C-alpha cells in the first residue's frame, strides 16, 4: 500500500478511500495498459475513445518527445509527416479559412465568442478546442455542437486505419493523443465543408501541433500569464515569444492589453515575421458608438475576451469580403504601447447577439439547484484564479440572502501538472470558505467504464498524493492566517501594566476545515447531502462520515439554508463535476 493511500486511510478514513479497496491498484494498472486497437470501422464510440486513450502513453511517442525536446522544430515536422500519412497536405488546410487563437487565459472563451458571432451570419463553423469537459467529441464542433458519437466514431477509425496502413520503417509510430485529435479535426472540417474553422492552440504556439497552419485568415492572442513553465519558459516574456509563434507573414493579428514586457516581445515577433499586429481597444470604446453589449459569459475578465473576439470576427468578415459590416473609424497608433490600435466599429446585430448567446461550459458558469449553488470555473493560473475570485465574490454579493438563513461556503479544488497550487490556494483563501474539499480529477474511483474521463498518464496514487499536498498547503495557509490574527490585536500582558510585553489573545480555531476524497462523486455526495435535486445517487458509500469533520459537517450541510460551492483549479475537475451534475452533457 502506497504512502498516499495509507495516509488517506489512517487520517481521513473516508469511505471514498476505504471503498476503493483492492480496486485502486487494479484500476491504476488497467489505466496504464494498452487497449487492443480494433481494426474494423463501425466500432462503438467508447471503443474508439479507448483506442484513442492508448495514445496518451504511446511508448514510441514518449521516446520521440525525448529526442525532439532539444529540437522543437522537429515536432512541427513530425506533425506535417502525420498529416501527409493521413492523406492531407499543409496547403489543404488553407481551405478552412482558419482563425488561430492562442493565449494563457481566455483563449477558449475568445474562440467561443468568435465562433458564435460568425455562426450568426449563417456561416457553417468548425471549432477545435481543448480540453473537453465530459466527452472528447466536444473538442470538435460543427455549428457550435459537438460532433455526434457516430460521426466521431466514423472519422476516428478512418483516420486511425489510414495512419496504420501507411506506416513504414521510418514512420512506425502513431501520433500522440492531442496530435491525433488535431489531425482528426482538420479531416472533419474539410469533409463537412465548413466555411471557417476556429482553432484554439493546445500549448504555447510556436511549436504547438496546430501551428502547421500556414495561411490563417487572422490570428489572436488573449491575455498572457505563467503556465506550462516546463515547456514554455518561466517568465511571461519567454511565454510571449512562444505565443507569438503563430503569427504569419501578412496575416493580421490582434491582442489585448498585456504587461509591457510580454507586449514588447509580441511586437518584436510580429515585426520579425512580417505580421501586422493590432492592439484591441477596450469593449467600452465599441459601446461608445452603439448600445451597451451584453455577454453570455459572466465575469469582468470576459470583456477583454469579447473585445478580441469582435476584432477577430470583424477582420475575418472583412478579409472574406462580407458585406454586412459597419464602416470603420480610422485606426490610430497607441503611443503608450507602440502598436496601432485596432479599428473602432459599430458592432452589428449579428455580433451583439453572438456575444449575448455565447455558452461555454465550465467557465464562470453557475448552476442553481435547490439550496445548492455551484460556481464552476476552470481557472488554473494565478491570473485566471484572481479573475475567478473576483467573479465569485461579485456573484455572492448579488445573491445575498435577506431572510437571515444560514449559509455554508465550500471550495472544491484540484490542480495538476507543474502548476503552483500553493500560490493558487493563497489567492482563494480570502473567500473565507467554511470547508475546503480536495479530490483528483476522477469521476468514479471504482469504475473505468467511461473512456472519455480516463487519463492514462498518471496513477491514482500520484493524484491522491497531490491532493494531500493541496490540503497541506491549505492548512498551512489557515494556520499562518490564524497566527497573524493572534498578534494583530494584542492586549496588555496579564503580569500588569508595568510589563513591556504584549500578550496575544487566546488562540481561535481556524475557520476552514479541510477534507480529501478519492473521487469527485464522493466529494459531491458529501457536499450535497442528497439535497441536489438532480445529483441523487441510489446509495451512499459506507463510512462516508467516519471522519469527525465529515460527520459534523454533514449535519451543518443538511440544515443550511444555502450552500455555495466554488469548483476551480482545473478544467478537468470542472468537467467531472459537470458530468455528474448535468447528465445531458453525457448524451
UniProtKB/Swiss-Prot annotation:
GO terms for cellular component: cytosol; mitochondrial inner membrane; mitochondrial matrix; mitochondrion. Optimum temperature is 37 degrees Celsius. Activity completely lost within a few hours at 4 degrees Celsius in the absence of ATP and glycerol. Pathway: Cofactor biosynthesis; tetrahydrofolylpolyglutamate biosynthesis. GO terms for biological process: glutamate metabolic process; one-carbon metabolic process; tetrahydrofolylpolyglutamate biosynthetic process. The modification Phosphoserine is found at residue 539. Inhibited by ammonium sulfate. Inhibited by pentaglutamate derivative of DDATHF, but isoform 2 is inhibited to a greater extent at lower concentrations of the compound that is isoform 5. Isoform 5 is virtually unaffected by H(4)PteGlu(5) and 5,10-CH(2)-H(4)PteGlu(5) at concentrations that substantially inhibits the activity of isoform 2. Isoform 2 and 5 are equally sensitive to polyglutamates of 10-CHO-H(4)-PteGlu. The keyword Coiled coil does not apply. PROSITE patterns: FOLYLPOLYGLU_SYNT_1 (PS01011), FOLYLPOLYGLU_SYNT_2 (PS01012). The keyword Transcription does not apply. It catalyses: (6S)-5,6,7,8-tetrahydrofolyl-(gamma-L-Glu)(n) + L-glutamate + ATP = (6S)-5,6,7,8-tetrahydrofolyl-(gamma-L-Glu)(n+1) + ADP + phosphate + H(+). ATP binds at residues 106-109, 363, 377. Monomer. NCBIfam families: folC (TIGR01499). Catalyzes conversion of folates to polyglutamate derivatives allowing concentration of folate compounds in the cell and the intracellular retention of these cofactors, which are important substrates for most of the folate-dependent enzymes that are involved in one-carbon transfer reactions involved in purine, pyrimidine and amino acid synthesis. Dihydrofolate, tetrahydrofolate, 5,10-methylenetetrahydrofolate, 10-formyltetrahydrofolate and 5-formyltetrahydrofolate are the best substrates. Folic acid and 5-methyltetrahydrofolate can also act as substrates. This is Folylpolyglutamate synthase, mitochondrial. It comes from Mus musculus (Mouse). The gene is Fpgs.
